[in-house]
Structure formats: C-alpha cells, structure tokens
Amino acid sequence: MNLGVSVLLGAVLVAGCGGGEEGVIDESVQMEAPAQEGTVTALAYCDDVITWSTGWTDFENQVLTLVNQRRAAGATCGGVYKAPAPALTLDTRLRCAARKHSKDMALNTFFSHTGSNGSTPLQLIISAGYAFSTEAENIGAGYSTPSAAVTGWMNSTGHCNNIMNPSLRHLGVGYYYRASGSTYAHYWTQDFGAQ
C-alpha cells in the first residue's frame, strides 16, 4: 500500500483518500495580498525547473485537467456544495514555484509548506514573478498518480475549497519523483493564484 500524504497548514487529520491509499491531511489556508505593481524578472530563478522530465510534465498537466473537470462539475467540500467554477489556466510562473517546492521537499527529505531554507509559498510565487491578489497552495506526498493526488485533495475540506474557489484563476503544478533517499518518493505541489 502506498502512503499518500497531503498537507496544508493546520491540525492533522487522518482520512481515506480512495484508490487504496490513505493520507494525512491538514486544514487549508489561503493568503491574500495587495496586487504587486511591476513584473519580477524570474528567468534565472526558474532555470533549474524549466527542463523537466516529460513524464513529470504529463503528470502535472493531468492534474490541471482533473482539477478543471472537478471545477466544471461542482463538488461537495466538507458537506458544503460548491457550484461549478471557471476552468483554471496554466501559469508557468506558478508552475515554477510549485516545481521548486516539490523538488526541494524530495531532495531535502521533508514535507511542509515551509521550504528547507525557510521560504514560504508566498516568497516562492513572488520570486517566480507572479504578482497576485490571492494565492493558495496544496501539497501532497506519496500519491503515485495524478488521479490519486486529486482524489486525496478533494477528500479534504480545505484542499477541496482551494480547488473549487472561483476567485482563483491560475494554477501551477509541480511533481517530483525520488525513489531512494526520500520519505514518500512522490511529491506534489499545487500553487493557485489570481491577479
């Protein structure tokens, strides 16, 4: 049995995530900030995550597709019905931030929204050049497929709320696989935003 883990800031809960996988999940948090003026040049910042495994990119794209299918259908998050929401569009800056965080978690063997160097999701997103008014992040580990990761997030009230939030318009997904030397092997980050 694979151990799937999906965490956002808050108290730990244990829940079944479908597909024979179990997950540990936390409550979700969204952050809001005034839209920043100007554009941050982020090409050098994102250099280490531009070239990516084709298989990993396919997984990331599948997550976007699955999330948009869930948004189009509407969903129940923690017993509360969420109406259908507009499709999210891929944002390469958010993908850069998500990839950097998944890579950091896998290579440095940790699982948290806070990076190994103390960075926050907000700092990664800004460093990648995304000026936002609202952002949210879902992370997961141990899920071996995009479907399992999305199912795990949808089974968590906070993660589901992030996915179904109609105010969020953009998504970047980062997937990183490290078979040996990491705790969970599969690491996922979803960074959502609105400008």
Q: Could you say what each language-model-derived stretch is?
A:
Residues 44-108:
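A short alpha-helix/helix-coil micro-patch that ends at or immediately precedes a cysteine
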Residues 13-16:
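C-terminal motif of bacterial Sec signal peptides marking the signal peptidase cleavage site
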Residues 18-21:
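Bacterial signal peptide processing site
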Residues 91-144, 163:
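Short, surface-exposed glycine/acidic/tryptophan-bearing loops
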Residues 1-7:
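Bacterial N-terminal signal peptides that target proteins for export
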Residues 24-51:
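Post-signal peptide N-terminal segment of mature Sec-exported envelope proteins
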Residues 77, 111, 159-161:
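Bacterial peptidoglycan biogenesis and beta-lactam-recognition machinery
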Residues 43-45, 132, 140-195:
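Disulfide-stabilized extracellular recognition modules
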